[in-house]
Amino acid sequence: MIIDVATYTDGRREEVDDLAAALERCRRGERGFVWLGVHDPTAEEFEGVARVLHLHRLAVEEAVQGHQRPKVERFDDVTFAVLKALAYYEDRSAVETGEVMVFTAEHFVVTVRRGQLGDLGPVREALQADAHRLRLGPRAVLHAVMAHVVGGYRAVDEALEQDVEEMEEQVFSPARTSDAARIYSLKREVLEVRRAAAPLVAPVRALVERGEAPPGDGSAHELEHRVERGLAHG
């Protein structure tokens, strides 16, 4: 379902009633972009969007089906990013995952959320309050989304680190107990964080090197740091 759709010109938001007409206005004026946000779209719902924006068939299928490996790919003039959103539930020592996918081109960005995690409302609100960043266009949205998702990795990583430290204290205490199942579970969750972050490091670096990252963007360095933390725990 469509969560939000608007155009942004010189950092100002305008509501959109007709996606195709809004996109044409942005292209004709050679400024501004459309930002469409959807959640758990069906094939039928996304078909119309894909037709208007001329999205690549393979990327559309992946966005609708979900369960994709984290990556950043290029289809003609559209960048397609797949990100894993993570949350850690300490009561059951479990990392839950969701998916966030982002299509970006010169005059549009489409954010697709699958599952309950990865709410992008705070990202849109933060950007709408920062006209300077919005003027950078869809690339600013892409990297704000990346920073938001990676921030979730940080929270999960820190929670896992605390649990690992507690387990180590128990193992080496005089009254230590053997909890092989929990140790195995924690190691499995550490791997979940690594699987989410590791595939993104190289493509995010490439975005920065190609000049597709906003000036001063730190997503690549943050991703590298998250992977290093996961490796340290492994």
Segments from the language model and where they lie:
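Peripheral, non-transmembrane regulatory/ligand-interaction domains of membrane transport proteins
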Residues: M1-E222, R226, G230-H233
